[in-house]
Each structure stands twice: as C-alpha cells, then as structure tokens.
Swiss-Prot record:
The active site is at residues 35, 253. This is Alanine racemase. Pathway: Amino-acid biosynthesis; D-alanine biosynthesis; D-alanine from L-alanine: step 1/1. The lineage of its organism: Bacteria, Pseudomonadati, Pseudomonadota, Betaproteobacteria, Burkholderiales. Signal peptide: none annotated. Catalyzes the interconversion of L-alanine and D-alanine. May also act on other amino acids. The keyword Isomerase applies. Its EC number is 5.1.1.1. GO terms for biological process: D-alanine biosynthetic process. Pfam families: Ala_racemase_C, Ala_racemase_N. Belongs to the alanine racemase family. Keywords: Isomerase, Pyridoxal phosphate. The gene is alr. It catalyses: L-alanine = D-alanine.
C-alpha cells in the first residue's frame, strides 16, 4: 500500500476564484497566471477550471505549448518574453504574445523575420526594478517597436511592488500614466493585490496569480476573509503512530520540544521530502497548525524528511489512521506558511512530485468528484 499522504486540486474552487476576480474587475479581461506549473497545482489539472479566462500568463515555452496541446486557442502571454532568437519562431508558430522588457529583446526582434505580426506587451519599470524600460527610455522603446514590420499590437505593461502594502500603487500608476501619455494601446497593470484592492488600476487587462489558487497576496489569510476565495489545493495524510510522553520527554531531531505534562502525540506521514516546510515551528510560542480528525492542533518537534509529529491533546480519540489535514479547507495555507517563516506561494510550488495528487473535478451539477490526476 502507498503512504497515506495525498494532495487534492479542487477545480470547483479554481472556477469560483476566477468568478470572484471577474466580479472584482468586471470591465477588465483576465490573464490567468499559471507560471511555475500553475503555482504547483499543475497546468493539466487547472486548465478545465480556468479556461473561462481571457488568456493565460506563464514563463516557459514548454508550458505554452502544453496549453495549445490541451486545446487552448486563446491568447497566451510569456511574462518574461523570450531568451534566444530561435524562440521567436516558436512564438509565431504557437501564436503567443510576448513581453518585451529590454534592449536585447528589441534587437532580437528587429532581426527576426516572422511571416506575420507578433503581439507584444512592452514592459515599463515603474519602481519594481526587476524588468522593464525606465520611464525616460520607454517612449523611444515603444517607437522602436512600433516601427518594426514584425510587431502587431502593443500593450503597455508594468508590475506593482507594493499593491499589498501600505505604500500602495499611486506612485507607480503616476509614473505609468506619464510615460504612456498619448501612446495608443491597451494597458495591463494589476496583479492579485491590485485586483482586490486597487480598482483604479484594473485597466484593460488584469493578471491575477495567487488569488486564483485561493491564497492571500499579503500572506495573511485574514486579509482575504469575505472575498469568497476558496483554497484550490489541500494536503492530507494520516496518523501512522501514536506515542505517550511523560514530563521531560523530548520529540524529534535536536530535542527542540519538551513535554511539560503527560501527553499523547501523533506521528504523521508527511515530511519535508513531501514539500512540507522543515522550518515549520513545532516549539515555542507560534507552532504550525494542523487538523487531526477535523480538530485544530499543533506541531511538536522538528519536521523530518518523511514524518512530523502533532499534539493530540485537543483530539483524545485520535488513533492510527485518523485523517490529518496539513493545509486546505479549514486550514489556510497562509497560516502554515506564517508559522514557517514563508509565504503560501512557496508551499504551493514546493509540493513534491512523490506526493500522489488527485483532482476534484467540475461536474455538470457543479459538484466535486475525485479523479486521478
């Protein structure tokens, strides 16, 4: 028999989250961002639920080809553009839209000889300082791109650094509007946080990522309470052993947790080789939350490669075989991430290939039925 650990991707939750985004930005078209294999959920697994988007945004050419193989005929945006001149032929073959963010990409594009015009998104650096043309250079870059016979439509694009924080986006929107003033073309500015909290930046296209998967851009689940977003990934396992501890007994590598009273602990078939964070706290003030038999409890001790331990005090009837939820419905991934010094994005993307993954599919009645991925 296989180990009892299993991840579930919930297609109804994905479809719901796309609907939430539509309601938040009713006048914008939606790029569903599926980079990093759909934030660890799997492009194949999420496609059916997200095909109601207006387009898909990603990084990898192979993932773009996969979307075409799955039957997607709509727009696909390469968020980092291309890296080699030979990539341009594939962009044309698979009818992709490409970001252009630097002089090197413009030079490669100038040397290209595609048979038809390519759709591009010209990226403006408004303060993130990763990719994009400086505002003082942007108009010249646009004019250069506009003069190329191989360039069709040009969308103006930027990315917000603080849409989820107190600094906000006003300074970046101001820089964007100044740099693109009187230039024709649509605009794409909003990431997940801007979709939720900055409607003035929605413009023609929005690019939601983390909220498609039901987690918070801030890393705090409380910040998306009331939005209607639902977790699209859950991670489950079972207790494989139970231990009785006496005061002074310690748990796990490094003996970081010491029992202060008689207590029962459960051993769960899940460890850092499955993608659960090794740095999740099982000692001190803020221990990582876990559900056992649907009851909330906490980690004890250090997470090891294949196992972790939990306090069974709140669930005295728990036994070997009792179900465990590591994150998912009833236990937001952001809470686990906070107790691990990271963000939900990282936990999603870190789910290990050895974890069996099933899909709760969308049916005609909009109910969920399990299917093997």
């Amino acid at each position: 028999m296989p180990r009892p650990i299993q991840a579930v991707i919930h297609q109804p939750a994905l479809a719901n989250n796309l609907d939430v985004i539509r309601r938040k930005a009713p006048d914008a078209r939606v790029w569903a961002v599926v980079k990093a294999n759909a934030y660890g959920h799997g492009i194949r697994r999420v496609f059916a639920a997200l095909r109601g988007a207006d387009g898909f945004g990603l990084l990898d050419l192979n993932e773009a080809v996969l979307l075409r193989d799955l039957g997607w005929q709509g727009p696909i945006l390469l968020l980092e553009g291309f890296f080699q001149p030979q990539d341009i032929a594939l962009i044309e073959q698979y009818r992709l839209t490409t970001a252009i963010h630097c002089d090197e990409q413009l030079r490669m594009l100038e040397s290209a000889r595609p048979k038809g015009p390519l759709a591009i998104q010209l990226k403006l650096n408004t303060g993130m300082n990763r990719l994009g043309f400086h505002p003082a250079e942007y108009r010249a870059a646009w004019e250069r791109a506009r003069a190329m016979p191989c360039v069709g439509s040009i969308v103006h694009m930027t990315h917000f650094s603080d849409a989820d924080g107190p600094r906000g986006i006003a300074h970046q929107v101001e820089a964007f509007d100044a740099a693109t003033a009187n230039l024709p073309g649509e605009a794409s500015l909003s990431n997940s946080a801007a979709v939720l909290w900055h409607p003035q930046a929605h413009r023609a296209w929005v690019r939601p990522g983390i909220i498609l998967y039901g987690a918070s851009p801030t890393g705090r689940d409380a910040d998306i309470a009331g939005t209607g977003l639902q977790p699209a990934m859950s991670l489950h396992s079972e207790l494989i052993a139970v231990q009785d501890l006496q005061p002074g007994d310690t748990v796990g590598y490094g003996s970081l947790f010491t029992a202060e009273r008689p207590m029962r602990i459960g051993v769960v078939a899940c460890g850092y080789a499955d993608g659960y964070p090794r740095h999740a706290s099982g000692w001190g003030e803020q221990r990582a939350p876990v559900l056992v038999d649907g009851v909330r409890t906490e980690l004890v001790g250090r997470v090891s490669m294949d196992m972790l331990c939990v306090d069974l005090t709140p669930c005295p009837k728990a036994r070997v075989g009792s179900p465990v939820t590591l994150w998912g419905q009833g236990l937001p991934i952001d809470e686990v991430a906070q107790a691990s010094g990271t963000v939900g994005y990282e936990l999603m993307c870190a789910l290990a290939p050895r974890v069996p993954t099933t899909v709760a599919t969308i049916t005609a009645s909009d109910s969920a039925a399990p299917a093997v991925a």
